[in-house]
A protein has these predicted regions:
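Structural cue for short, hydrophobic secondary-structure segments
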Residues: 37-40, 67
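Primarily recognizes the serine-hydrolase "nucleophile elbow" in alpha/beta-hydrolase
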Residues: 106-108, 113-184, 200
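A domain-start/cap signature at the N-terminus of enzymes
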Residues: 1-34, 46-53, 60, 64, ...
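Cap/lid segment of the alpha/beta-hydrolase catalytic domain
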Residues: 69-93
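Active-site glycine-rich loops that stabilize anionic/oxyanionic intermediates
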Residues: 40-44, 250
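Alpha/beta-hydrolase active-site loop
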Residues: 86-109, 130
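Conserved alpha/beta-hydrolase "nucleophile elbow" surrounding the catalytic nucleophile
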Residues: 39, 120-122, 196
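Short beta-strand/loop motif that positions the catalytic acidic residue
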Residues: 193-195, 199
Length: 343
């Protein structure tokens, strides 16, 4: 049964001038978890939720959904401003607005403040990383889909270059950016990272940088990862603290399995693996979906999304290969091991 639609609700303070939508399944009990869902560029809160299926999962599993929405007045492409220092600094801008929404929903509906999770796609994935860095005490877990590491950009020019290839930094440098954002010493949220190998909008080495960042924050050795195949994706995991899915047939978007929850749409790509359900499982909200006998759909490739558009700047930014030692090596080794990358 389709979930009820997201409903807009007031909140304050709102220094980032965002809108707040939330969904509370019928009969939701006090002490339920909360999942915060951040849309990508050119999307709306409800449109992204329909595609990714979070409200469907909420109705099934018994958690609340909070879906912030960007305004065109802030960003003409309705991207969250993950590259603007005024919006990704603790106590300021869009991050402060999202934190205020979380506190309002948790307090008003008596949700479990110890089980708040956040996920997002593309610009929403980058803003997810920003929230996890600037307000880590609010979250038990996060999931970054086709996103970027925190601290990768401080202006539009940086953002465009980073989307092409993440800056080359040592894992400790990436980790230091997170540790400095809130002056927080832990415990840290568990992190799930998802990226398509065919993504030409946000280079997959941003996933490698995100792995390096959060492995360093958690004090994990990159070489200690467990490797497995999962519905055509390559999964590397470090216990219950960190995981990364690399999907060979995925371009830029959120991967879904339409036989489960969600619906295909622009940048919601039906490639036979439900990221939403697997993320919920990693967070401890759901068991893994039962296997299905239906044939896997053909891979869907998406057009270039509406990212911050500055053609005159983009034209002069040459692509740069900036590998991330350790994280990149692990992912490339995994691809080779299953025959998806030539030796």
């Amino acid at each position: 049964m389709p979930a009820a639609p997201l409903a807009e609700a007031p909140f304050s303070p709102n220094p980032g001038n965002l809108r707040m939508f939330r969904y509370l399944p019928k009969g939701l009990k006090a002490g339920a978890p909360l999942v915060v869902v951040l849309h990508g560029c050119g999307q709306t809160a409800s449109g992204y939720d329909t595609g990714a299926g979070w409200c469907e999962l909420a109705a099934e599993l018994g958690f609340a959904v909070l879906a912030p929405e960007q305004k065109a007045a802030n960003n003409p492409n309705t991207c969250f401003d993950w590259f603007n220092p005024e919006d990704i600094t603790r106590g300021q801008g869009e991050c402060a607005s999202i934190a205020a929404m979380i506190r309002a929903v948790v307090d008003t509906h008596r949700l479990d403040a110890r089980r708040v999770f956040i996920t997002g796609l593309s610009a929403g994935g980058a803003m997810t990383a920003a929230m996890l860095a600037t307000y880590p005490e609010l979250f038990a877990g996060g999931a970054i889909i086709a996103g970027l590491p925190f601290g990768a950009a401080a202006n539009v020019r940086d953002a465009l270059e980073t989307m092409r290839s993440a800056p080359l930094k040592a894992p400790q440098q990436w980790g230091d950016a997170v540790r400095a954002a809130a002056g927080y010493a832990g415990p840290w949220p568990k992190i799930s990272i998802w990226h398509g190998a065919l993504d030409t909008t946000v280079n997959v080495n941003n996933a490698q940088a995100s792995v390096a960042q959060w492995a360093d924050v958690h004090g994990l050795a990159l070489g200690a990862a467990k490797q497995e195949m999962a519905d055509g994706a390559i999964r590397l995991s470090w216990g219950d603290q960190l995981e990364v899915y690399t999907i060979p047939v995925l371009s830029h978007g959120t991967p879904i399995d339409s036989r489960d929850v969600g619906r295909p749409a622009p940048f919601i790509l039906d490639v036979g693996i439900s990221s939403s359900r697997r993320i919920a499982r990693f967070w401890g909200l759901a068991p893994l979906a039962a296997s299905r006998s239906a044939p896997r759909p053909a891979p869907v490739r998406a057009a270039t999304p509406q990212e911050p558009a500055l053609p005159e700047i983009e034209a002069v930014l040459a692509p740069r290969l900036t590998p991330h030692p350790g994280a990149e090596t692990l992912i490339r080794r995994a691809l080779k091991a299953v025959g998806l990358l030539k030796r």
